[in-house]
Amino acid sequence: MLAKRIIPCLDVRNGQVVKGVQFRNHEIIGDIVPLAQRYAQEGADELVFYDITASSDGRVVDKSWVSRVAEVIDIPFCVAGGIKSVEEAGQILSFGADKISINSPALADPELITRLADRYGVQCIVVGIDTWHDATTGRYHVNQYTGDEARTKVTTWETLDWVEEVQKRGAGEIVLNMMNQDGVRNGYDLHQLNLVRDVCNVPLIASGGAGTMEHFLDAFQTAHVDGALAASVFHKQIINIGELKQYLKQQGVEIRVC
């Protein structure tokens, strides 16, 4: 069995790490490189960096910090933000990223997933999905351009359909960003994760809602995800990654402990 992964998420805007609640009202957390170093030292399995306004601003991720991160950490990291071409992805990988993630650009051009997978291999192509639960209809819908709340829009895709579509096109991994849960720290949406797990045959990463160590355990044992991504509990030092991994190991979760 592959070890489960603990993945800190660093949302980047204007060269700094920020964090919002339900993708709104972002506050500055700190500088990118020191945070990346701290998480690597604490025992993170990998890091994810989202340049959150790149797609809504119509630009590609700022590559200046990618190489600086690559110089100081020795764990894999994934970069996302406005990547719309094979060439742009190649640049980011050449700067030292191990994976690239696409979200809004894939919704605008689904064939981009296939072009990237064909060129670089499915193992380094991640598709991020920003999913919103509509309490009125009970349905889960995919949102686009979520880095800017003024430009965020609901797409015509329902979440489960989009999960199946991106796999057909070559996604090697899916990060499910559950917007309703984001930043509120009351647990991952296990019901939604189980629905997605049933149709997802590639590694699935849960994102949005972690507030306690038990929430990570629930995601692994109840929803059978491959990795759990979190931000605010790590940024605010509510949970230490090393202690979290020791707890999960004690609960029988297969996990890499430093």
From Swiss-Prot:
Pathway(s) this gene product operates in, as recorded in its UniProt entry: Amino-acid biosynthesis; L-histidine biosynthesis; L-histidine from 5-phospho-alpha-D-ribose 1-diphosphate: step 5/9
Keywords tagged on the record: Amino-acid biosynthesis, Cytoplasm, Histidine biosynthesis, Lyase
Coiled-coil ranges per UniProt: none
Gene3D superfamilies attached to this UniProt entry: Aldolase class I (3.20.20.70)
Catalytic activity: 5-[(5-phospho-1-deoxy-D-ribulos-1-ylimino)methylamino]-1-(5-phospho-beta-D-ribosyl)imidazole-4-carboxamide + L-glutamine = D-erythro-1-(imidazol-4-yl)glycerol 3-phosphate + 5-amino-1-(5-phospho-beta-D-ribosyl)imidazole-4-carboxamide + L-glutamate + H(+)
Active-site residue numbers: D11, D130
Documented EC number(s): 4.3.2.10
Record's subcellular location: Cytoplasm
InterPro entries found in the cross-reference section: Aldolase_TIM, His_biosynth, HisF, IGPS_HisA/HisF, RibuloseP-bd_barrel
GO molecular function: imidazoleglycerol-phosphate synthase activity; lyase activity
Enzyme class: lyase
Any Pfam family matching the protein: His_biosynth
GO terms (BP aspect): L-histidine biosynthetic process
GO cellular component: cytoplasm
Chief location of this protein within or outside the cell: cytoplasm
Family: Belongs to the HisA/HisF family.
Subunit composition and interactions: Heterodimer of HisH and HisF.
Described function: IGPS catalyzes the conversion of PRFAR and glutamine to IGP, AICAR and glutamate. The HisF subunit catalyzes the cyclization activity that produces IGP and AICAR from PRFAR using the ammonia provided by the HisH subunit.
PANTHER family hit by this protein: IMIDAZOLE GLYCEROL PHOSPHATE SYNTHASE HISHF, IMIDAZOLE GLYCEROL PHOSPHATE SYNTHASE SUBUNIT HISF/H IGP SYNTHASE SUBUNIT HISF/H
Protein name: Imidazole glycerol phosphate synthase subunit HisF
Organism: Pectobacterium carotovorum subsp. carotovorum (strain PC1)
